[in-house]
Amino acid sequence: MICRRPRGIVKVLTFLAITAALPASGQAPIETLHVPELDAGFHLLYELKPGEARKQFEIWHESNPEDPLGSASVAASYLFEECIQQGVLTSKFFLDNKLFLGKIPLHPDPTLRAAFFAADKQAQDLAQQRLRTHPGDANALFAMTLSLGMEADYASLIDKHQLDSLKMVREADKYAQRLLVAAPDAADAYLGLGVANYIIGSLPGIKKFFLGFAGIHGDKRVGLQQLAIAAAGGHYLRPFAKILLALAALREKKPELARTQLKELVAEFPENTLFASELAKLNVPAAK
């Protein structure tokens, strides 16, 4: 989306309202988006067990070689692992403008990087094959939205290539809009869009001016709302959205919102030391 007016957050909330009314309208959620084997893999991922998570994803992909969700899930595991290794998902990173918004790229693991882009490309290739014959296929649209959104996140968070990130988010948004027609409950679609909107909206004025001159806009408010949508109604990416929302909330001086997200994450994933550590940091001032 990268904050296009007037089609922005109003349209997103309209789709969520449609989702809430699904039983009355007779439309059912797209169940194929919710695969138990992938659920198990993502749970392992959020317990900081990326290797075990990938085994789950790869087993499912071997049984469903033409479905792009398997490859997209594998790519997500590499991105999450890279973010953990680089310290991206910490308050130290988010609250330091030099780290969060600076031009200096991080130093990703070459093996993880190559594996991420390979899995991400495979997901897009498989998705495009499906869309050529089934343009409304929910899994394919979700895989395209997710894979492009992850590329955008990698570009902005790891490589610090904001313009490249924006180009990919614009493309991801096209698939997100189509996805929400096919599957109005697919709130995961807003994770990548929310991250990019928030980061671009947080840039210093001069940088935003030049991007705006080129017709590219970011909006922190819209980004936070999109992250909140994914955190509340997402499926596979809900915990990812919750930690990002918590960290963004800390930047915006909204500690209670951050605390709520972190408490819920710690309760759901007790083996995740990162979530527990961030909650402990937040609780130190409150305990004094």
Question: Positions of the model-derived regions?
Answer:
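Bacterial N-terminal signal peptides
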Residues: K11-P23
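Short coil/linker segments at helix-helix boundaries
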Residues: A28-E37, L44-Q56, E66, S77-G136, ...
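N-terminal secretory signal peptides that target proteins for export/translocation
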Residues: M1-G8
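Compositionally biased, proline/threonine/alanine/serine-rich low-complexity intrinsically disordered stretches
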Residues: G26-I30, A286-K288
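N-terminal carbohydrate-binding/catalytic regions of secreted carbohydrate-active enzymes
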Residues: S73
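A cross-kingdom marker for long, charged
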Residues: F240, L247-K288
